[in-house]
């Protein structure tokens, strides 16, 4: 049984930051490259997010990212040529769970980073806008039938630019529950940041009211740490 689910709103001092939709003037581009150590220090830690967050029991596969399109699609591989810096955390409880997967792909130059982001954008552009998945019961998984909507938004924050794939999953009425996911892919200089936040609610058929603000604040906190 899940043991710790705090309020859906994230309680962190860092969450004053947020991502814009491109209307604000971005900060000027830096002249130098961003180091892997800089990204390692910029990624949020459990203590930055809230007291109920912790590292997951299972370590993530460093060669794969989180799923971008959702549904039954497989997660894309990490675009080649980068040093991977990652940090993942979960907040689990009786009413649901939250997850945060942060991956920084640090390339040797800006051109390689742009190519890496383009590869991930190609995956996102192939996502279906509406998905219906029947109930699944296997030795490893039991999941009720659900529908999921997918949309892509443009992002521009503090000199970082890219996109976010926003997914809303809703389970069949006899198994009420939702899963709201945002996968942000942003590039600045030689770095591609893939930041995925998800909130899962049990016995609740409504989207979390704090979801839209929370994922933007989490991403904004990281990019503003880098500058």
Predicted regions located by residue number:
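Bacterial N-terminal signal peptides that target proteins for export
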Residues: 1-9
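Post-signal peptide N-terminal segment of mature Sec-exported envelope proteins
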Residues: 28-50
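Core hydrophobic alpha-helical membrane-spanning segments
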Residues: 11-13
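Short, well-structured beta-strand
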Residues: 175-202
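A short acidic/glycine-rich loop-to-helix N-cap element
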Residues: 197-214
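Bacterial signal peptide processing site
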Residues: 20-23
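C-terminal motif of bacterial Sec signal peptides marking the signal peptidase cleavage site
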Residues: 15-18
């Amino acid at each position: 049984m899940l043991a710790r689910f705090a309020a859906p709103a994230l309680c962190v001092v860092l969450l004053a930051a947020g991502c814009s939709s491109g209307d604000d003037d971005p900060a000027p581009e830096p002249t130098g490259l961003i180091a892997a150590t800089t990204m390692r220090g910029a990624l949020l830690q459990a203590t930055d997010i809230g007291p109920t967050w912790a590292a997951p029991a299972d370590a993530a596969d460093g060669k794969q990212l989180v799923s971008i399109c959702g549904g039954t699609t497989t997660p894309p591989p990490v675009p080649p040529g980068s040093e991977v810096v990652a940090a993942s955390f979960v907040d689990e409880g009786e009413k649901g769970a939250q997850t945060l997967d942060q991956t920084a792909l640090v390339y040797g130059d800006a051109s390689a980073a742009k190519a890496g982001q383009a590869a991930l954008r190609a995956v996102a552009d192939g996502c279906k806008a509406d998905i219906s998945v029947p109930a699944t019961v296997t030795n490893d998984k039991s999941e009720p039938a659900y529908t999921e909507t997918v949309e892509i938004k443009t992002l521009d924050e503090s000199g970082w630019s890219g996109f976010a794939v926003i997914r809303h999953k809703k389970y069949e009425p006899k198994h009420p529950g939702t899963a709201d996911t945002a996968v942000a892919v942003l590039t600045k200089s030689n770095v591609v940041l893939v930041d995925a936040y998800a909130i899962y609610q049990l016995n609740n058929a409504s989207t979390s009211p704090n979801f839209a603000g929370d994922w933007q604040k989490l991403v904004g906190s990281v990019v503003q740490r880098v500058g």
